[in-house]
Amino acid sequence: MSSFDKTMKFNFSDDSAETNVNEVLITVYDALQEKGYNPINQIVGYLLSGDPAYIPRHRDARNLIRKLERDELIEELVKSYLEQHKEA
């Protein structure tokens, strides 16, 4: 069997991606607060709609959040929530 016929598995460390998502969310949250918006409502609006108008340009928040896929953001939020609220 040729090596082209085998399914390859790609492994990478999620640590840098997780840190990046956390940093972006914190930066966006802070930017929204500084501009007087309710950060949770605005982030939820962005995640549901994909419309970047929910995120201000302040502190480059809009550009930062658009570099990440919305499903990546949701995945990290769910993962973080479950890790913090999991019963032992």
UniProtKB/Swiss-Prot annotation:
UniProt xrefs under InterPro entries: IreB
Domain of life: Bacteria
Matching NCBIfam families: PRK05473.1 (NF003997)
Similarity field: Belongs to the UPF0297 family.
Descriptive protein name: UPF0297 protein YrzL
